[in-house]
Amino acid sequence: MATTKTSIATLQKMKREGTKISSLTAYDSSFAKLMTEQGVDFILVGDSLGNVVQGRDSTVPVTVDDMIYHTQCVRRGASNAFVIADMPFMTYSTPEQAYDVAAALMQAGANMVKLEGGHWLVETIEGLKTRGIPVCAHLGLLPQSVNVLGGYKVQGKEQQQADDTLNQALALEQAGAQLLVLECVPASLGKRITEQLSIPTIGIGAGADTDGQILVMHDMLGMNSDYLPKFAKDFLAQGGSLADAFRLYSEQVRSGEFPTAEHSYK
């Protein structure tokens, strides 16, 4: 059971020491409590709740009130956990809007907020940092931009796009981001970015060389019998119970057993 409160300093220390970071999404108190007890290092209250909780076909309809409610639920269940909350679609289109939404999520129990996007977020991230709000950046596949991207596709496969993603990662780190999620990029790009950043990188479909891994809880529990993303694994089938599934996930991320090349993109 997690008895010591995790902080961003904990995650930064893990990167320096080469200890892999395990993280999962959660949306309620019971699952947040259980996964924290089984060694998961931090929790993301993801706007993926639009898909897996609300049954929508994207994250776009998720509201700030939705995120506040689920962040409060997660915090009640996991008082010592490091909790990151997603900022919903079009709630950080200006720095001033971002400050208000981020403050509400922090007051709901988040330790950090996550924003999707690249260079255009530099001013916003600088402003959030100045105001004492820690930021997790998110590059690669951006679910909130799925309509622009034309679907859920691997990003950064072409050299120019890969170089641009790296440059954006460096700019966001310089602006003050303290964590970076990389989603659905080639494993080689995940490794390249991780080696050049001083902040921890958390991959989802970004290969085994990022500083940590994150999965949507429903994916790693195999809850969608019709579809399992390439980058996911059904840990419940292997573990046999929810507690063992979370424990196995944390252990296999830590040991490097997960993810394998099978779960990665070229």
UniProtKB/Swiss-Prot annotation:
Q: Which reaction does it catalyse?
A: 3-methyl-2-oxobutanoate + (6R)-5,10-methylene-5,6,7,8-tetrahydrofolate + H2O = 2-dehydropantoate + (6S)-5,6,7,8-tetrahydrofolate
- Provide the GO biological process annotations: pantothenate biosynthetic process
Provide the E.C. number(s) assigned to this enzyme.
2.1.2.11
Q: Which GO terms describe its cellular component?
A: cytoplasm
CDD domains, per database record: KPHMT-like
Group of enzyme by EC: transferase
Ordered alphabetically, the record's keywords are: Cytoplasm, Magnesium, Metal-binding, Pantothenate biosynthesis, Transferase
Q: Which positions in this protein are listed as binding 3-methyl-2-oxobutanoate?
A: 47-48, 86, 114
Pfam families in the cross-refs? Pantoate_transf
Output the InterPro entries linked to this UniProt entry. Pantoate_hydroxy_MeTrfase, Pyrv/PenolPyrv_kinase-like_dom, Pyrv_kinase-like_dom_sf
- Identify which residues the record assigns to the active site: 183
Superkingdom is Bacteria
GO molecular function annotations of the record: 3-methyl-2-oxobutanoate hydroxymethyltransferase activity; magnesium ion binding
Coiled-coil regions listed = none
This entry's comment on the bound cofactor is:
Binds 1 Mg(2+) ion per subunit.
Q: Which cofactor does it need?
A: Mg(2+)
Listed HAMAP family: PanB
Job description of the protein? Catalyzes the reversible reaction in which hydroxymethyl group from 5,10-methylenetetrahydrofolate is transferred onto alpha-ketoisovalerate to form ketopantoate.
- Description of how the protein assembles with itself and partners: Homodecamer; pentamer of dimers.
Q: Which NCBIfam families match?
A: panB, PRK00311.1
Q: What is this protein called?
A: 3-methyl-2-oxobutanoate hydroxymethyltransferase
